[in-house]
Amino acid sequence: RTAILKLISQCDVFITNNRLKSLVRAGLDYDSLKDRFPKLIYGLVTGYGQTGPDVDAPGYDGVAFFSRSGMLADMAEPGGYPASAPGCVGDGATGAALFGGICAALLNRERTGMGDFVETSLFGNAVWLCGTMSAFEQYGYHYPKKRSEMGALYTFYKCKDGEWLHLAVTQHDRYWKPLAEALNVPELAEDERFKNAALISRNRAQLIPLLEQAFSQFDYDEIAARLRERDIVFDRMRHYRELATDPQAVANGFVKEHIYENGHSFMMAMLPVHMRNMDETGTGRGPQMGEHTDEILKQYGYSEEAILRLKEAKAVKQHP
């Protein structure tokens, strides 16, 4: 604890994802530190928030973010298996929220000289991101949905070559007729059942199979060209494995090659924010647990003997 307090005394921001009860027990919670370090920005990530019945519950991305929010259950069709949670997506969203809060707290400290406590949680971020769906539920628009209950012009269709296309038409009056023409079914736009947006929504269960049949007559590349000509919003449903080589991702620097010390390389996802007047962040791996322990402790005046004693007491660890 003494070593940690030395680090805190000279840092701008202290970040932890330990549970509150553990922090209180160690005397490292915000209330225990704020008077001693009034300029400290204290960042805390929790699973479920600062209070409530689950305040001390452990939480991971797949559980506190995806499962608790309803994302996994309600992205699947009724009666089917829940969707699989993609790894670390909730962690990334929560980290971005914490980053924004810390930046705001640092700016406020520049103005007032005071530090602050910045807290965010996996569950809280999931609730925020699913706020639209939560509102829909309160107004009678329920999940999960069968395919026949989805918007006929804002859903996915399978092409002749097996590729899936996600269609996203929201301006029905502008794009419904061009879409029907692109699919070689212009008569659908004149059909009394589908003459306007209200009728398309009301009769979507009848329209979806007709559009499924129409899309099944085209390979993806062919129908994609026809849709682009008409400025219709769509994209191919792709796979994680394609991200590393996606031409658009590469062109924009969304992925960059990183070479490890052992010579192995891979395409690393980069921060999705670019600034013209600041240097871009390069690629690089995160440090191993305890990789810089000796280096940091020496910076704070610890001798080799003192560091060895800390290791023997298992108070710190240096990665091999």
Role assignments for model-derived ranges:
Residues 1-24:
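Rossmann-like NAD(P)-binding element
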Residues 10, 22-169:
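Active-site-adjacent "lid/gating" segments in soluble enzymes
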Residues 13-14, 39, 233:
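Residue-level detector of anion-binding/catalytic polar loops
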Residues 153-230, 234:
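Aromatic-enriched alpha-helical interface/lid elements that frame and gate functional surfaces
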Residues 229-281:
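A glycine-rich dinucleotide-binding beta-alpha-beta segment and adjacent secondary-structure elements
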Residues 263-309:
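Flexible, small-/acidic-enriched active-site or ligand-binding loops
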Residues 305-320:
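Amphipathic terminal alpha-helices
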